[in-house]
UniProtKB/Swiss-Prot annotation:
The keyword Glycoprotein applies. Belongs to the TMEM120 family. Glycans are attached at residue 111. Residues 346-387 are annotated as: Disordered. GO terms for biological process: defense response to Gram-negative bacterium; positive regulation of innate immune response. InterPro entries: TMEM120A/B (IPR012926). It is found in: Membrane. The chain crosses the membrane at residues 130-150, 155-175, 191-211, 216-238, 264-284, 302-322. Its main location: membrane. The modification Phosphoserine is found at residues 352, 354, 365. This is Transmembrane protein 120 homolog. One of its GO terms (cellular component) is membrane. Residues 1-39 form a coiled coil.
């Protein structure tokens, strides 16, 4: 290849680079527009909540006996308020959220918001797969520790627990930022478990550890099995939530979702309660070990307290969450309806953008078509209503 051919190739590359610069300028403009629309949405959500609080406060005067006509209107307003809260929550899922203090300490001031619904589902799915893989590894290592009494194998397993729970706390904090409704106790549970694993890691080899060792390994084998059952339950929930919004002919209704959720939960609860009982048994065993044999290291009493704390927290939270879910079925129904509509709307917008690309390919350049599609996607709910 001679120098003239290379020169011509460079000139062609320059033309392509000019197109790239033009595309990048449009991209930057759209990013600025996106930020502007996000601020508008934040302000409108704040305004909606302020007005709703005023209406809710005014409704309190109708708590006493009211005429039948007014009672029906009051009930309708209460239902519409619940529905609007669910709608606002769903809108917030498409907007960036601030990281919590824990993430700011661990990762710094980094934006971890996932704005695309499918990406959120994918991240949640990846989180569940991560737990499954690590639980299988933990199950295998705990099983080997039951067969072989090697200190190096014990330390490797306990170090795995420390790393696993540390990673879970970070991933769950990211999920929380992105709208996950995980209860505060379950996050605290993993922080406490991290501390417990750290105490186990520095627990010196001795008579007290050898007495408790086998019981602890059996406990981990059982917990790994329960985690596998939980993985199946969570995967089923994710699939059905996805089906609510992504299927044109939905293969599951909201009533069907609730029915499956309660069946799965009723199957899982006995295994969970047995696990909680095992935690209480561990706490009692360690409490006795703290006094006999004598000269027990401080790790014994600390681990006894941590297992007791985990038992009380898990039992109380589970017994509180199940009745709460029953009481809030109406609110949950509105949330699922809003989620389903939002996911279907996003899919329709995506399909419309694809149809536009095909139909106007001869009239618009690829860059212009992309600009149109992104501009449509960044419209606020108010703008979409006006159009």
């Amino acid at each position: 290849m001679n120098i003239d051919s290379l020169k011509n190739e460079w000139e062609e590359l320059n033309k392509e680079f000019a197109e790239l610069e033009s595309c990048n300028r449009r991209y930057i403009e759209l990013l600025e527009q996106l930020h502007s629309h996000q601020q508008i949405c934040f302000n409108e959500i704040k305004h909606q909540r302020y007005r709703m609080n005023q209406i809710t406060t005014s409704l309190r005067q109708f708590k006493g006996p009211v005429p039948a006509e007014d009672k029906e209107k009051v009930d309708d307003l209460h239902k519409m308020t619940l529905k609007r809260k669910a709608q606002l929550h769903e809108i917030e899922q498409s907007l960036p959220a601030k990281s919590g203090r824990y993430l700011q300490i661990i990762l710094g001031d980094v934006n971890v918001s996932i704005l695309n619904r499918n990406d959120k589902v994918r991240y949640k799915d990846d989180y569940e797969k991560f737990k499954l893989i690590l639980n299988v590894i933990g199950l295998i290592m705990a099983f080997f520790n039951l067969i072989f009494n090697y200190r190096a194998l014990e330390l490797a397993f306990i170090f795995l627990l420390v790393w696993y729970y540390c990673t879970l706390t970070i991933r769950e904090s990211i999920l929380k930022v992105n709208g996950s409704r995980i209860k505060g106790w379950w996050r605290a549970h993993h922080f406490i478990s991290t501390v417990a694993a750290g105490v186990l890691l520095v627990w010196p080899q001795g008579e007290h550890w050898q007495i408790f060792r086998m019981q602890f390994m059996y406990f981990n084998v059982y917990i790994s099995i329960v985690q596998y059952l939980q993985f199946g339950y969570q995967k089923g929930l994710l699939y059905r939530l996805k089906a609510l919004g992504e299927r044109h002919n939905m293969d599951i209704t909201i009533e069907g979702f609730h029915s499956w959720m309660w069946r799965g939960l009723s199957f899982l609860l006995p295994f969970l309660f047995i696990g909680y009982g095992y935690q209480a048994y561990n706490a009692w065993t360690l409490y006795k070990l703290a006094y006999s044999p004598p000269d027990a290291p401080w790790h014994v009493s600390v681990m006894s307290g941590l297992f007791l704390l985990l038992f009380v927290g898990n039992m109380a939270t589970t017994l509180w969450v199940v009745p709460e879910k029953i009481r809030e079925r109406a609110k949950e129904r509105y949330r699922l309806q809003s989620m389903g509509k939002s996911m279907k709307l996003r899919k329709e917008m995506k399909n419309s953008a694809s149809d536009l690309d095909l139909s106007s390919g001869s009239k618009l350049s690829p860059t212009a078509t992309t600009t149109t599609s992104i501009a449509t996607a960044t419209q606020t709910p108010a703008e979409k209503k006006e159009t």
